[in-house]
UniProtKB/Swiss-Prot annotation:
Zn(2+) binds at residues 374, 378, 402. Chloride binds at residues 169, 477, 481. It comes from Pongo abelii. Disulfide bonds join 133-141, 344-361, 530-542. A motif (LIR) lies at residues 778-786. This is Angiotensin-converting enzyme 2. Residues 772-805 are annotated as: Disordered. Glycans are attached at residues 53, 90, 103, 322, 432, 546, 690. Residues 652-659 are annotated as: Essential for cleavage by ADAM17. GO terms for molecular function: carboxypeptidase activity; metal ion binding; metallopeptidase activity; peptidyl-dipeptidase activity; virus receptor activity. It is found in: Cell membrane; Cytoplasm; Cell projection, Cilium; Apical cell membrane. A motif (PDZ-binding) lies at residues 803-805. The cytoplasmic tail contains several linear motifs such as LIR, PDZ-binding, PTB and endocytic sorting signal motifs that would allow interaction with proteins that mediate endocytic trafficking and autophagy. Residues 614-805 form the Collectrin-like domain.
Amino acid sequence: MSGSSWLLLSLVAVTAAQSTIEEQAKTFLDKFNHEAEDLFYQSSLASWNYNTNITEENVQNMNNAGDKWSAFLKEQSTLAQMYPLQEIQNLTVKLQLQALQQNGSSVLSEDKSKRLNTILNTMSTIYSTGKVCNPNNPQECLLLEPGLNEIMANSLDYNERLWAWESWRSEVGKQLRPLYEEYVVLKNEMARANHYEDYGDYWRGDYEVNGVDSYDYSRGQLIEDVEHTFEEIKPLYEHLHAYVRAKLINAYPSYISPIGCLPAHLLGDMWGRFWTNLYSLTVPFGQKPNIDVTDAMVDQAWDAQRIFKEAEKFFVSVGLPNMTQRFWENSMLTDPGNVQKVVCHPTAWDLGKGDFRILMCTKVTMDDFLTAHHEMGHIQYDMAYAAQPFLLRNGANEGFHEAVGEIMSLSAATPKHLKSIGLLSPDFQEDNETEINFLLKQALTIVGTLPFTYMLEKWRWMVFKGEIPKDQWMKKWWEMKREIVGVVEPVPHDETYCDPASLFHVSNDYSFIRYYTRTLYQFQFQEALCQAAKHEGPLHKCDISNSTEAGQKLLNMLRLGKSEPWTLALENVVGAKNMNVRPLLDYFEPLFTWLKDQNKNSFVGWSTDWSPYADQSIKVRISLKSALGNKAYEWNDNEIYLFRSSVAYAMRKYFLEVKNQMILFGEEDVRVANLKPRISFNFFVTAPKNVSDIIPRTEVEKAIRMSRSRINDAFRLNDNSLEFLGIQPTLGPPNQPPVSIWLIVFGVVMGVIVVGIVVLIFTGIRDRKKKNKARNEENPYASIDISKGENNPGFQNTDDVQTSF
């Protein structure tokens, strides 16, 4: 048989083997899809029941259903390993196997897997049920939604906002801290067992594309793209930041620095994530009709149902389908109030089996009107790819899923669209001033959040990678917040806090970079869809409603789900394979030009040194080595606790004896910041149970003077080695060393005297010997005057010579 015949037979055999493996894999996946549909639905339904009615029974039901689903996935993942990916040619089959071969959390031992589920459920419950009570009336308590969020959205009272901001983090963040520490360890273990560097790397894997010619994309490339696009966005953000700072100075003149960072609790919501609610304080041309249509919605008696029906009309107008009847029957669109505890954070649900729902405690505001479009965008995506195999029913990447609803929000927010649905009056006229008002409102929501998103995820990536030690989480968090976002903590937070976990997405295990990538995608999509809609004019004026051409272009991409690489899906819509910030910058170009003109006489950027509590802070410097030498002790958290307790004692004593007031200051009321390794820090004091009431520095100084010696004694230091900068040393005796100083001085003086006497004695003896020797060697005839008959002493009787003293 010829060589070519052998080669042909070999190729046939290999093809047959591959065909057999692929056929077996297809059969396996068909069986998996059928079984997964039922188990996933039961698990999702149990999770929905818990999120809409938080009870112990529903927690247990959710855990049981989740355990069954996890066990099934673990078993199927093991079976999927039997099919080598390199021998699979069919891309659809290959992608499904690739997804299933990822073990996820099932790679952990049974005990660790259960512990991780318990941690996740507990964090979710703490977040959703956390409440803050009035210190003066413990029966008056507020949940995050609507109570605390209402304060953070609308209050102009600096101290009330500070109370809400700090109390949420103190009550919820501190509870979450030990759980989040465990979560990081277990998630990292899971990720590494799945062949990722850490959990952040595991999350970035959602963007990875391998083996698809020129459409490949690496996890490292995501980091590079995010960083370089952020640098392009920074100039616009810095000018927005400077403009907002100037307006906040008008509202809070004694609390803002004209060159400093923005206090975190003044930025429109609990986290400073979206600055939308700052619009009323920052509107450039207030005499123009208000483009925030909240009042119009209230006046026209809109409710949650109307809001979502209007969102549905928008999607239908571009050729996308209506919501299903089951959607309207099963969704929870309003807060049930005291009837049951619910997770109020807006979420869209694809439970499987054609069951799509939204959970949202909708309020009648323009912000929630746009949020409804966002959440319904998720549902449209879910419905579009429902025909895909189970494992490919997802967005091309997580950012795509978030972007779909945001595209619609860009159009729904335009004055043109708001006029068309009766929320702006028919005689509303657009001009340069209304254009700037509109773009500023959009920028507060869109541009203002980008550094927040980037910094949060960068911090988490560093934590998962081990680049931030656990005992420096909060220190690094606020350093990065100052440097990257230009936002400062209104009060210092130590390592008992867990401020990142006070955000829903962190405590509920969502990756966050999706909200950064989605923002870039949404403007790329918007530009492409506006072209399909034959829009002419600036991008920010485009409204794609009623354009079925734009809708069809979008729908073609949505239907792909995860069956094609996201780079290919992006290219199909926008003509490019990568993220591009240009459409976003084009959209905001008129605003950027206006902001630069407005900021001509303002400082653009921020100093990271300033803090809102600086004026009332006292700096402390401690010199342990110079004071105690080899007996110096280590300065650690226990010493800080002792210091805070000592100051609290001084405050109690001062207020009782000088002001005749019994105020029970505690160590938690002494706030320490800027702790440096060479032992220096700042502190200030707040009233018990009221962080917004800072005790004036002058009062604290008086209390310190009054108890200075007691504080010194607690640390075995004196006024020179325990310095309160700005407070003069007291007249009280310093801390006595083990041996009295006068004894030491006396001993030194006596030693010097004795040494002096000894030196004198030996010097005298030495000099006498020298003189005698000189006398003996002198020529006896040298000075004789012979004419005078001088006596020759050499012949005199030596007995007459007296010994010299």
